[in-house]
Amino acid sequence: MASTTLSIATTIRSSSYPTLASINHFPSRTTTIEFPSRFGGGSSSTLTHRATHLRPIAAVEAPEKIEKIGSEISSLTLEEARILVDYLQDKFGVSPLSLAPAAAAVAAPADGGAAAVVEEQTEFDVVINEVPSSSRIAVIKAVRALTSLALKEAKELIEGLPKKFKEGITKDEAEEAKKTLEEAGAKVSIA
């Protein structure tokens, strides 16, 4: 190993900036600065720390057979990969449509005895059906508390019922809004 010190040679001139005409009038000197090696100095060729091979965190233990198949598949060209996919689809009797998750939800059951997949509703609408005249003020206050509507807009909302009060909200929010409006005297439904 060569030298373990770093040398930098620099020329130091006067602190003022000389002009081109007077550049030779200032004395200059060359200074060498040496930095010690960060591995213990001297001419030691041994390192105090050694790098070790670490496996990536996402590495998966796989049998040799699987590793061999994986490396062979990864070396295929696009055309060969397409042919392999077609071959495996024919061999196992599957089609790309049968693998799509949306196709499973839309497809009808194969036999008449199987129950259809029921999709759970995630978005709800709160509908104000009726507001008795004796509780209009309380309902307007409840509407303003649940929304950011001004007094005029809240008043217009409870006229000409039934009207959707809130749309596309979660079940918990819909239940809370229904409870608040019913306590104020309105007749409310969740759709």
UniProtKB/Swiss-Prot annotation:
InterPro entries: Ribosomal_bL12 (IPR000206), Ribosomal_bL12_C (IPR013823), Ribosomal_bL12_C/ClpS-like (IPR014719), Ribosomal_bL12_oligo (IPR008932), Ribosomal_bL12_oligo_N_sf (IPR036235). This is Large ribosomal subunit protein bL12cz. The gene is RPL12A. CDD domains: Ribosomal_L7_L12. The keyword Acetylation does not apply. Residues 1-58 form a transit peptide. Belongs to the bacterial ribosomal protein bL12 family. Its main location: plastid. Keywords: Chloroplast, Plastid, Ribonucleoprotein, Ribosomal protein, Transit peptide. The lineage of its organism: Eukaryota, Viridiplantae, Streptophyta, Embryophyta, Tracheophyta. It is found in: Plastid, Chloroplast.
